[in-house]
């Protein structure tokens, strides 16, 4: 299990990947409104996880992983989503999955 400072540092890195993911989807003209909405929710959950008290952060990370799963499914199902946006969603999803195994 990660120490609190390590967990926050790792979560901050994941937060950056999620922000990149959101920008990529927002910038993709082919992204559906559904994909964009699900990715925005993923981004919102990341903000929530960063602001969560230390003793509740593990639960927030689990909730964030669930949002990542939803974003990944939406992105993979979006036929007009570009490869850059899809890759960014996959990267953010993988990052939170790895973090979850460490907490």
Segments from the language model and where they lie:
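Function-determining surface determinants
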Residues: 1, 5, 33, 58, ...
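Short terminal alpha-helical segments
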Residues: 1-39
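Short, charged, amphipathic alpha-helical segments
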Residues: 8-12, 33-41, 58-65, 83-90
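Extended alpha-helical protein-protein interaction scaffolds
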Residues: 17-18, 46, 97-101
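Charged, low-complexity interaction regions
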Residues: 23-34, 51-57, 76-83
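Long, amphipathic, charge-rich alpha-helical segments that form helical bundles/coiled-coils
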Residues: 38-43, 48-77
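Amphipathic alpha-helical binding modules
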Residues: 70-103
């Amino acid at each position: 299990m990660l120490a609190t400072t390590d967990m926050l540092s790792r979560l901050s890195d994941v937060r950056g990947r999620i922000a990149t993911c959101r920008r990529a989807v927002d910038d993709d003209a082919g992204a559906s409104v559904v994909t964009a909405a699900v990715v925005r929710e993923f981004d919102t959950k990341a903000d929530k996880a960063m602001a969560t008290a230390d003793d509740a952060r593990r639960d927030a990370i689990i909730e964030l992983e669930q949002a990542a799963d939803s974003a990944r499914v939406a992105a993979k199902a979006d036929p007009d989503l570009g490869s850059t946006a899809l890759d960014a969603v996959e990267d953010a999803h993988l990052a939170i999955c790895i973090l979850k195994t460490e907490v």
